[in-house]
C-alpha cells in the first residue's frame, strides 16, 4: 500500500473514532480517557461468576472522601445486585496507619458499615485526631463498641497485613488520588475524572454492565 493511501485510511479511521467518541459523549455514554481510565495491567479479582467487583479507595483523612460519602451511601441503597462493593482504605496524609487499622478493625468486628459515617464525622466535623490509642478506644466506647475488643482487633497482626495489602492494591491500580472507584480490576473512575460524584457512580454502573456483557 502506498504511503498516501495508508495516510488517507489512517486519517479516516481516526476521524471515525473521533465521531464515535462525539456520538457517545452526546448520548451520555461514558467515554474512556474522559469519564474513566483503563488499568494498563488488569488486577485479579475474586468474585463469583456473574458478579462485578467494585472497590472504593478512600481515606478517613481525605475531605473529598468525606464529601463523597453521602452520595456513595445513597447509591449503595440502589446499586445493581450483581455489584460486589467493598472499601479499601489507603495510606493518605497524616495518621494513615491508624486510619487503615481503624477500618479493618471495625470490619473484623462487623461494624465497618455502621461506623463509616461516624468515623468520618469524628475527623471532619468534630476534628478529632484519633492518633492515640486511648483516644481511639474512648471514641469507640462512646459509640457502643467494646473498647477492649476493638483495640485487640486494632493491634492484631492480621489488621497490619490487611493494611499493607490495601496499600499495595492502591499502588498497583495506578490510581493517583482518593476517592477513586475501581471496577473489576480493569477500570478507574472518580468524581474528578468523571467531573461529578453522581457521574462517577453512573460510570461505575455502565462499566459494571459492560463487564457483565463480556466487554
Regions found by a protein language model. Give the residues of each.
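Extracytoplasmic thiol/disulfide redox context detector
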Residues: 2-94, 167, 209-215
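C-terminal cap of thioredoxin/glutaredoxin-like
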Residues: 5, 142-215
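Extracytoplasmic/secreted proteins, especially bacterial periplasmic and envelope-associated proteins
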Residues: 53-56, 67, 71, 97-101, ...
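Sec/Tat-exported extracytoplasmic proteins
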Residues: 61, 76-79, 106-110, 123-127, ...
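Solvent-exposed loop/turn segments at secondary-structure junctions
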Residues: 61-64, 91-95, 122-125, 159, ...
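Structural microenvironment flanking redox-active thiols in thiol-disulfide oxidoreductases
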Residues: 78-109, 113-141
Amino acid at each position: 500500500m502506498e504511503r498516501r493511501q495508508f495516510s488517507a485510511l489512517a486519517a479516516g479511521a481516526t476521524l471515525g473514532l473521533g465521531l464515535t467518541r462525539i456520538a457517545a459523549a452526546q448520548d451520555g455514554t461514558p467515554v474512556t480517557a474522559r469519564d474513566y481510565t483503563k488499568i494498563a495491567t488488569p488486577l485479579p479479582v475474586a468474585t463469583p461468576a456473574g458478579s462485578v467487583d467494585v472497590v472504593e479507595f478512600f481515606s478517613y483523612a481525605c475531605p473529598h472522601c468525606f464529601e463523597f460519602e453521602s452520595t456513595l451511601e445513597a447509591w449503595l441503597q440502589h446499586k445493581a445486585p450483581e455489584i460486589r462493593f467493598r472499601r479499601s482504605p489507603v495510606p493518605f496524609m497524616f495518621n494513615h496507619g491508624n486510619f487503615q487499622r481503624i477500618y479493618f478493625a471495625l470490619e473484623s468486628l462487623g461494624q465497618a458499615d455502621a461506623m463509616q459515617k461516624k468515623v468520618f464525622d469524628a475527623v471532619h466535623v468534630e476534628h478529632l485526631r484519633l492518633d492515640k490509642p486511648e483516644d481511639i478506644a474512648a471514641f469507640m466506647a462512646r459509640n457502643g463498641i467494646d473498647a477492649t475488643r476493638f483495640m485487640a482487633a486494632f493491634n492484631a497482626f492480621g489488621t497490619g497485613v490487611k493494611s499493607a495489602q490495601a496499600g499495595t492494591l492502591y499502588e498497583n491500580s495506578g490510581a493517583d488520588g482518593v476517592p477513586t472507584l475501581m471496577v473489576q480490576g480493569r477500570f478507574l473512575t472518580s468524581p474528578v475524572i468523571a467531573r461529578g460524584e453522581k457521574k462517577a457512580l453512573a460510570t461505575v454502573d455502565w462499566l459494571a454492565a459492560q463487564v457483565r456483557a463480556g466487554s
